[in-house]
Design a protein with these regions (language model features):
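Hydrophobic single-pass membrane-targeting/anchoring helices
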Residues: 1-35
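Extracytoplasmic/secreted envelope proteins and their assembly/folding machinery
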Residues: 77, 119-123, 211, 215
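Mid-length scaffold segments of soluble, non-membrane domains
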Residues: 90-137
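Extracellularly exposed regions in secreted/surface proteins, prominently low-complexity, repeat-rich
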Residues: 24-26, 137-225
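Ribonuclease/tRNase effector modules and their secretory precursors
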Residues: 5, 12, 122, 134-142, ...
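Short, compositionally biased low-complexity segments enriched in polar/charged residues
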Residues: 53-103
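Short extracytoplasmic
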Residues: 30-62
Length: 225
């Protein structure tokens, strides 16, 4: 009887290995098609905010509208569009968000490229959201009858890119700025007035936080299938 136990254990380990391989193989096949197979509200959830690390939860950003399957050259700012096309960009999905106070807008993009290596190549080319002044990367999408109705390219002050998954052929990109088209550049809204930072740095900081939140959300959605 005792001689059977190791065989059973080994059999169990072998079965687990085969099962895990099948799961990984299925996930590997799903990842490149995730942008097409996930629902739009799974890619761009109603609310985006950084994962809680204890303490008070950030209020987050509320989705205003979604644009599906846009041409790469039309959806991205020229600086990113050219390098994205060179790296196999086939389509771009975009969604516009507004912060909880309604004072800042952001258009987030999911770019479908040729490979994950190509996405990381773009990140390393100085367009990363954590690079030195990467600037707006996505053509803003205005959403009528919302706080983002006046959102447009000239209002974009911050932005950047990030690879949202470890293996997928995706690049996340963002443009952030004020929702008020009549507000003069340099006049900070709300509690940001006392931050002591130039406006471009404030919106760049918002870009970083929101793109990290989106990347975490998208990666979780892909892994959860």
């Amino acid at each position: 009887v005792f001689g059977v136990l190791p065989l059973l254990a080994a059999g169990g380990l072998a079965f687990a290995a085969v099962k895990n391989h099948r799961i990984q193989t299925g996930n590997d096949a799903f990842i490149p098609a995730a942008w097409h197979n996930l629902r739009t509200d799974e890619i761009f959830p109603d609310l985006l905010r950084e994962p809680s690390t204890g303490g008070q939860q950030a209020p987050g950003w509320v989705r205003q509208g979604i644009v599906k399957d846009s041409d790469c050259k039309k959806a991205l700012m020229p600086r990113l569009a050219s390098v994205a096309v060179e790296n196999g960009c086939t389509t771009v999905l975009r969604a516009t968000y507004v912060d909880a106070g309604g004072e800042a807008a952001a258009t987030v993009a999911l770019c479908v490229l040729g490979s994950n290596d190509q996405a990381r190549t773009i990140e390393r080319s100085g367009l990363s959201v954590v690079a030195d002044h990467p600037g707006p990367m996505v053509v803003p999408v205005a959403v009528p009858k919302t706080a983002a109705a006046g959102w447009r390219t000239s209002l974009g002050h911050g932005g950047g890119t990030m690879s949202p998954t470890l293996f997928g052929p995706y690049l996340a990109a963002i443009t952030v700025g004020p929702t008020d088209p009549d507000r003069r550049y340099g006049n900070l809204p709300g509690e940001w007035k006392s931050s002591g930072q130039p406006e471009s740095l404030v919106y760049q900081s918002l870009s970083t936080d929101l793109l990290f939140a989106f990347s975490h959300s998208f990666d979780k959605a892909v892994d959860g299938r």
